[in-house]
């Protein structure tokens, strides 16, 4: 059975994206589908620098669950037609080579779906999805092409 890795890039513990991610995680759990939810990506993950040798504990924990997951769902808010820096930073950390694994080994050929939630009409959400999809493809992820937008007024 599938194991699903869920990332929520919400900007606060109670953001709409985090609420949706938690709802989906609970739904999967009730259906007996193993899943691993990580949110608050802006906390405990320093910006990746060439001079930074220590891997954050949160990234080590994510790696452990990403290794055994075969699908990924990313919840991403949209700001100014793009996705947030803390999501890109987390993905960059996870893409690094480690312990004999090559660059993007954790991502290679895994299927990923993106769910976007915005306050308003979502006028620039499609472009943000396209930008994020391109970035995810760079990590060797297989991005579902369907665009999912949830608006909250």
Label each residue range with its predicted role:
Residues 2-33:
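N-terminal beta1-alpha1 ligand-phosphate binding loop
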Residues 8, 39, 147-149:
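Residue-level recognition of beta-strand->loop/alpha-helix junctions
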């Amino acid at each position: 059975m599938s194991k699903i890795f869920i990332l929520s890039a919400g900007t606060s513990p109670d953001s709409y994206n985090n609420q949706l991610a938690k709802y989906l995680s609970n739904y999967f759990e009730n259906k007996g589908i193993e899943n691993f939810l990580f949110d608050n990506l802006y906390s405990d993950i320093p910006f990746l620098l060439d001079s930074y040798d220590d891997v954050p504990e949160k990234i080590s924990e994510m790696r452990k669950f990403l290794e055994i997951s075969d699908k990924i769902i990313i919840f991403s808010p949209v700001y100014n037609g793009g996705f947030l820096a803390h999501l890109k930073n987390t993905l960059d950390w996870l893409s690094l080579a480690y312990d004999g694994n090559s660059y993007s080994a954790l991502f290679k050929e895994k299927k990923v779906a993106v769910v976007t939630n915005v306050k308003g009409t979502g006028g620039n959400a499609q472009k943000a999805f396209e930008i994020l999809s391109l970035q995810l493809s760079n990590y060797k992820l297989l991005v579902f092409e369907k665009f999912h937008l949830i608006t909250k007024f």
